[in-house]
Amino acid sequence: MAHHKSAIKRIKQNAKKNARNRHISSTLKTYIKRVREAVEAKDKEAATVALKAAIPVIDKTATKGVIHSSNASRTVSRLTKLVNTLG
Protein backbone atom coordinates (compact mmCIF):
# COMPACT_ATOMS: atom_id res chain seq x y z
CA MET A 1 0.00 0.00 0.00
CA ALA A 2 1.19 3.50 -0.77
CA HIS A 3 2.52 5.67 2.05
CA HIS A 4 2.59 9.09 0.41
CA LYS A 5 -0.53 11.17 0.28
CA SER A 6 -0.11 11.81 -3.46
CA ALA A 7 0.32 8.10 -4.19
CA ILE A 8 -2.85 7.27 -2.26
CA LYS A 9 -4.72 9.93 -4.24
CA ARG A 10 -3.36 8.51 -7.52
CA ILE A 11 -4.58 5.02 -6.59
CA LYS A 12 -8.08 6.40 -5.99
CA GLN A 13 -8.04 8.38 -9.25
CA ASN A 14 -6.83 5.37 -11.23
CA ALA A 15 -9.56 3.18 -9.77
CA LYS A 16 -12.21 5.74 -10.78
CA LYS A 17 -10.80 6.11 -14.30
CA ASN A 18 -10.54 2.35 -14.68
CA ALA A 19 -14.18 1.85 -13.71
CA ARG A 20 -15.32 4.63 -16.06
CA ASN A 21 -13.25 3.32 -18.97
CA ARG A 22 -14.48 -0.25 -18.44
CA HIS A 23 -18.10 0.92 -18.51
CA ILE A 24 -17.57 2.96 -21.68
CA SER A 25 -15.70 0.11 -23.40
CA SER A 26 -18.43 -2.35 -22.48
CA THR A 27 -21.12 -0.04 -23.86
CA LEU A 28 -19.12 0.42 -27.05
CA LYS A 29 -18.76 -3.34 -27.56
CA THR A 30 -22.51 -3.79 -27.05
CA TYR A 31 -23.35 -1.26 -29.77
CA ILE A 32 -20.86 -2.83 -32.18
CA LYS A 33 -22.29 -6.28 -31.41
CA ARG A 34 -25.82 -5.08 -32.23
CA VAL A 35 -24.68 -3.92 -35.67
CA ARG A 36 -22.87 -7.19 -36.39
CA GLU A 37 -25.86 -9.28 -35.25
CA ALA A 38 -28.22 -7.31 -37.49
CA VAL A 39 -25.86 -7.85 -40.43
CA GLU A 40 -25.63 -11.59 -39.68
CA ALA A 41 -29.44 -11.74 -39.65
CA LYS A 42 -29.35 -9.97 -43.05
CA ASP A 43 -31.72 -7.30 -41.73
CA LYS A 44 -30.71 -4.14 -43.62
CA GLU A 45 -33.15 -1.87 -41.77
CA ALA A 46 -32.12 -3.02 -38.28
CA ALA A 47 -28.44 -2.87 -39.24
CA THR A 48 -28.80 0.72 -40.47
CA VAL A 49 -30.60 1.78 -37.29
CA ALA A 50 -27.99 0.02 -35.14
CA LEU A 51 -25.17 1.66 -37.10
CA LYS A 52 -26.69 5.13 -36.68
CA ALA A 53 -26.89 4.49 -32.93
CA ALA A 54 -23.34 3.10 -32.76
CA ILE A 55 -21.47 5.86 -34.61
CA PRO A 56 -22.02 8.60 -31.98
CA VAL A 57 -21.04 6.18 -29.22
CA ILE A 58 -17.83 5.25 -31.05
CA ASP A 59 -16.96 8.92 -31.64
CA LYS A 60 -17.70 9.86 -28.04
CA THR A 61 -15.50 7.00 -26.81
CA ALA A 62 -12.63 8.36 -28.90
CA THR A 63 -13.26 11.91 -27.66
CA LYS A 64 -13.06 10.73 -24.06
CA GLY A 65 -9.73 9.04 -24.83
CA VAL A 66 -10.84 5.49 -24.11
CA ILE A 67 -9.90 4.44 -27.66
CA HIS A 68 -7.64 6.17 -30.18
CA SER A 69 -9.28 8.35 -32.81
CA SER A 70 -7.80 6.19 -35.60
CA ASN A 71 -9.32 3.12 -34.00
CA ALA A 72 -12.70 4.87 -33.92
CA SER A 73 -12.47 5.88 -37.59
CA ARG A 74 -11.44 2.38 -38.59
CA THR A 75 -14.30 0.81 -36.63
CA VAL A 76 -16.91 3.16 -38.13
CA SER A 77 -15.52 2.53 -41.60
CA ARG A 78 -15.59 -1.25 -41.24
CA LEU A 79 -19.09 -1.30 -39.77
CA THR A 80 -20.40 1.00 -42.52
CA LYS A 81 -18.79 -1.21 -45.15
CA LEU A 82 -20.37 -4.26 -43.51
CA VAL A 83 -23.86 -2.71 -43.52
CA ASN A 84 -23.44 -1.61 -47.15
CA THR A 85 -22.76 -5.20 -48.22
CA LEU A 86 -26.41 -5.95 -47.46
CA GLY A 87 -27.18 -3.86 -50.53
From Swiss-Prot:
Pfam families the record matches: Ribosomal_S20p
One MF annotation (Gene Ontology) recorded for this entry: structural constituent of ribosome
Keywords recorded for this protein, A-Z: Ribonucleoprotein, Ribosomal protein, RNA-binding, rRNA-binding
Region (Disordered): 1-22
GO cellular component, as recorded: cytosol; small ribosomal subunit
Listed SUPFAM superfamilies: Ribosomal protein S20
The organism's place on the tree of life at top rank: Bacteria
GO BP annotations, alphabetical order: translation
InterPro entries in the cross-refs: Ribosomal_bS20, Ribosomal_bS20_sf
Function noted in UniProt: Binds directly to 16S ribosomal RNA.
Family: Belongs to the bacterial ribosomal protein bS20 family.
PANTHER family linked to this entry: 30S RIBOSOMAL PROTEIN S20, SMALL RIBOSOMAL SUBUNIT PROTEIN BS20C
Protein name: Small ribosomal subunit protein bS20
Gene giving rise to this polypeptide: rpsT
